[in-house]
């Protein structure tokens, strides 16, 4: 089962992913978290489900890769994020990806491992931007993908809905 969670920025996609990852057995992968200084967002951390942490992007990072005001750290993305996806692919039943977005898509290695994961039999829960990027559209338009749109109205019920779908797909009792 391949589940994509989409929704506007700030609606709670990462919060939902973090809750799911705590509740689901044998999951691997990563999520991203805002970095704030004096109340202002200055970047994003990448955090693996097994506790590794790095910097995905910052406003003051020396990097040739840029998305908006953020300079993207491909080194940490690939050495921490991509590596966590490769480990999860080898060792886990469920792969968590937060997110398949503009910053992450700057990495060829990230795109390759995401394609490999989506082409496999592995279960996936990923957040994905509402985007017209060809790679994103290709993932969203797969026959084996179920897309959930997170919003203020379903924010509290979507967790249980996704858990039910995953459990049903895995043949577990509700």
From Swiss-Prot:
Record SUPFAM superfamilies: P-loop containing nucleoside triphosphate hydrolases
EC category: hydrolase
Record's keyword terms, sorted: ATP-binding, Hydrolase, Nucleotide-binding
Family: Belongs to the THEP1 NTPase family.
PANTHER family in UniProt: CANCER-RELATED NUCLEOSIDE-TRIPHOSPHATASE (PTHR43146:SF1)
Function: Has nucleotide phosphatase activity towards ATP, GTP, CTP, TTP and UTP. May hydrolyze nucleoside diphosphates with lower efficiency.
Protein name: Nucleoside-triphosphatase THEP1
Lineage: Bacteria, Thermotogati, Thermotogota, Thermotogae, Thermotogales
